[in-house]
């Protein structure tokens, strides 16, 4: 029954623009097409995406991961930088499943906003597609949710979902790690996607501007640098060195102190050398401007190390050489030692 005294309402009147959503899908399809890989049977456009596990996996185990970008999005809104957070979104999930030896196969995203800006959303999804290309996985589906009243104009939230596969016999679980094994660290590209609540607090205290010079670069480029994706490089090392790589840790929230212990068995500890790598200028500046203690830095930020590998001592040089061939900056940052009474499982000395 209609109200004869009121104009008819449409979905657009309620704040949902179906035409804008359709326009975004048209923008997304060619971006997703660039990420396609063998195994994709049906991608964007259907009710569900279909993927056939590659036959090279003899006894495949599926590995899944999901994550977001956290409060780094607040800076994306404030500084109008939307083309890199999509890479962050992919990186957070694919790097997580990589540590168990999995090859990422496909990725799905969720983009939620109050009012859909096609240009902003397309910039974000363009970053997601680029991240998928870097990881070698297909952007196989996603959801764009325009929800009036749920988010302020110009703001959005992101979630990502990655699925990969590893042969059951090749799962990396850290169980073979023993004292004497070497800890290698792969350089990060910046703060990645963690610790940004503290980053923002420090930027506010310092009165920082996105366009101010930071060692020859605009500060926005340094602070918003996308999370490095380690997938192809580490998979190449796994293909060549296999069991010599005993453990992998993605250095995310909790920094080195909380993430390295996740791959260690009871009674083992990682002793990291403070001078084993140079802390990048961004972290030095953040620490100085925020008067942040060393222990807090190591527990909040990656401090320049985005991925850790624990490798057999007699293969450490060979593994490092392979990773350098793949374009990684590799440092020998410590070793595995027996855990003494009262000793944390990761210490920086």
UniProtKB/Swiss-Prot annotation:
Record localization: Cytoplasm
Organism domain of life: Bacteria
Principal subcellular localization: cytoplasm
Reaction(s) this enzyme catalyzes, per UniProt: 2-formamido-N(1)-(5-O-phospho-beta-D-ribosyl)acetamidine + ATP = 5-amino-1-(5-phospho-beta-D-ribosyl)imidazole + ADP + phosphate + H(+)
GO biological process: 'de novo' IMP biosynthetic process; adenine biosynthetic process
Record EC number: 6.3.3.1
Name recorded for this polypeptide: Phosphoribosylformylglycinamidine cyclo-ligase
Lineage: Bacteria, Pseudomonadati, Pseudomonadota, Betaproteobacteria, Burkholderiales
């Amino acid at each position: 029954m209609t109200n004869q005294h009121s104009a008819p309402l449409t979905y657009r009147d309620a704040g949902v623009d179906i035409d804008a959503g359709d326009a975004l899908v048209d923008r997304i399809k060619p971006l997703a097409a660039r990420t396609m890989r063998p195994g994709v049977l049906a991608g964007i456009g259907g009710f569900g995406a279909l993927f056939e596990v590659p036959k090279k996996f003899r006894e495949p185990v599926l590995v899944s991961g999901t994550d977001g970008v956290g409060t780094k999005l607040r800076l994306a809104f404030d500084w109008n930088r939307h083309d890199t957070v999509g890479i962050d979104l992919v990186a957070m999930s694919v790097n997580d499943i990589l540590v168990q030896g999995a090859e990422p196969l496909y990725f799905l995203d969720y983009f939620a906003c109050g009012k859909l800006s096609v240009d902003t959303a397309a910039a974000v999804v363009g970053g997601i597609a680029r991240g998928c290309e870097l990881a070698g996985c297909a952007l196989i589906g996603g959801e764009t949710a325009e929800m009036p009243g749920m988010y302020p104009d110009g703001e959005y939230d992101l979630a990502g979902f990655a699925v990969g596969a590893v042969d059951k016999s090749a799962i990396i679980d850290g169980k073979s790690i023993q004292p004497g094994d070497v800890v290698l660290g792969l350089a990060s590209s910046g703060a990645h996607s963690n610790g940004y609540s503290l980053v923002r607090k420090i930027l506010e205290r310092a009165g920082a501007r996105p366009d101010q010079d930071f060692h020859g670069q605009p500060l926005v480029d340094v602070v918003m640098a996308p999370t490095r994706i380690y997938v192809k490089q580490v998979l190449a090392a796994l293909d060549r060195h296999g069991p010599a790589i005993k453990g992998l840790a993605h250095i995310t929230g909790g920094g080195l102190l909380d993430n390295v212990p996740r791959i260690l068995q009871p009674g083992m500890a990682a002793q990291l050398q403070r001078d084993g790598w140079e802390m990048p200028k961004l972290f030095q500046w953040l620490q100085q401007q925020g008067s942040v203690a060393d222990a807090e830095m190591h527990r909040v930020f990656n401090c320049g190390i985005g991925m850790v590998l624990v490798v057999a001592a007699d293969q450490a040089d060979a593994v490092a050489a392979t990773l350098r061939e793949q374009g990684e900056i590799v440092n020998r940052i410590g070793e595995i030692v027996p855990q003494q009474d009262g000793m944390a499982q990761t210490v920086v000395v």
